[in-house]
Curated annotation (Swiss-Prot):
InterPro entries assigned to the protein according to its UniProt record, in alphabetical order: A_deaminase, A_deaminase_dom, Ado/ade_deaminase, Metal_Hydrolase
HAMAP family: A_deaminase
Binding site for substrate: 21, 23, 181
Origin organism lineage: Bacteria, Bacillati, Actinomycetota, Actinomycetes, Mycobacteriales
Broad enzyme group: hydrolase
Biological role stated in the UniProt entry: Catalyzes the hydrolytic deamination of adenosine and 2-deoxyadenosine.
Keywords of the record: Hydrolase, Metal-binding, Nucleotide metabolism, Zinc
Cofactor binding: number and manner: Binds 1 zinc ion per subunit.
Natural source organism: Mycolicibacterium gilvum (strain PYR-GCK) (Mycobacterium gilvum (strain PYR-GCK))
Cofactor: Zn(2+)
Lipid biosynthesis as UniProt keyword: no
Protein known as: Adenosine deaminase
């Protein structure tokens, strides 16, 4: 008998997460405690529920630039080893509680050095927190594998330095590189030296593109920079029209991305909040999924978007009528697209995802 698609049952399903920002997923209570512990005085609220409401309200801004503003508060309390370690550990525990079995968590080390830490020390603290979070999850009966992506801010000039950081820690849990931040005015091609460095070291990277800016951002990310994955990429629908018979007609860029199986790290709730799309029901996720693009489900920022992987999946189920087989396909899409080795990806798909979905399908 097929298990009903309720939130409680979706929570039981194994999940793979590729696009989640460490500084966008703190517990409100942790933000308060770290602020008090380390003397951060700029919080807009001093009650966990009120603070959570502040982040939710700020996220629903309709603008990527305004959506990013509240990160000053989370980054502000993540400026020493212990704070970074705690946030990383709790991140893993929270994901494991939602039955995420594989996650790639990204953050920008350059934003966490105001307290005197070196870039290397920042990464070391986060990786140690991830490792302790995995152990805590295992002790609670939940197995999760967490890896790290280091991100460079696209408005800054440290991307080559951050790419080198990714390579230094590639055997310690860092599996890739990313650029993030406001897209308009900061095209991916400004960071070609960083991407060339990653390619020259046979390393993987993703690029935030096609979220708040259009097709040129996606084109640069793929054609000039050589991205392995796209962060968001929702504006690819601008390259999909209708033919004379009313069927889909893919432009050359959209066709290339589908042909090459470029993964889309789609974050439905976040895209609504930033104004990239009007609603979940109008999100291009379903259109792309039906056209067999490699779409994946992601959270982006769990605190700001007040979301989990289970909630993101439920919202897609409610909007588009998906069944368990669809959720399994999206999960396998994510695992196929992960930046770990092929044997590791295959093991999680064959030994964890497929068997557990088989139970849910009945």
């Amino acid at each position: 008998m097929t298990t009903p698609l309720t939130l409680e049952n979706i929570r039981r399903a194994p999940k793979a997460l590729l696009h989640d920002h460490l500084d966008g997923g703190l517990r409100p209570s942790t933000v308060l405690e770290l602020a008090e512990q380390y003397g951060y005085d700029d919080l807009p609220a001093h009650d966990a529920d009120e603070l959570a409401e502040f982040f939710r309200t700020a996220a629903h801004s309709g603008s990527l630039v305004r959506y990013l503003e509240p990160f000053a508060h989370t980054v502000g309390v993540m400026q020493n080893h212990d704070a970074l370690h705690r946030v990383a550990r709790e991140c893993v525990e929270d994901l494991a509680d939602d039955n995420v079995v594989y996650a790639e968590i990204r953050f920008a080390p350059e934003l966490h050095i105001d307290g005197g830490l070196s870039l290397d020390a920042v990464v070391e603290a986060v990786l140690a927190g991830f490792a302790d979070g995995e152990k805590a999850a295992a002790a609670a009966g939940r197995t999760i594998t967490v890896r790290c992506l280091v991100t460079a801010m696209r408005h800054a000039a440290r991307s080559r330095e951050i790419a080198a950081l990714a390579i230094r820690f590639r055997d310690q849990g860092v599996v890739g590189f990313d650029i993030a931040g406001a897209e308009a005015g900061y095209p991916p091609s400004r960071h070609l030296d960083a991407f060339e460095y990653m390619r020259s070291n046979n390393a993987r990277f993703t690029i935030h593109a096609g979220e708040a800016f259009g097709l040129p951002s996606i084109h640069e990310a793929i054609a000039f920079c050589g991205a392995d994955r796209l962060g968001h990429g929702v504006r690819i629908v601008d390259d999909i029209d209708m033919d004379a018979e009313g069927g889909p007609k893919l432009g050359r860029l959209a066709a290339l991305l589908r042909d090459k199986r470029i993964p889309f790290e789609m974050c439905p709730s976040s895209n609504v909040q930033t104004g990239a799309v009007a609603s979940i029901a109008e999100h291009p996720f379903d259109r792309l999924a039906r056209l067999r693009f490699r779409v994946t489900v992601n959270t982006d920022n769990r605190l700001m978007s007040d979301t989990t992987m289970s909630l993101e999946m439920l919202r897609l189920v409610e909007a588009f009528g998906y069944g368990w087989s669809d959720l399994e396909r999206f999960t396998i899409n994510a695992m196929k697209s992960a930046f770990i080795s092929f044997p590791e990806r295959l093991a999680i798909i064959d030994e964890v995802i497929k068997p557990r979905y088989a139970v849910l399908v009945g």
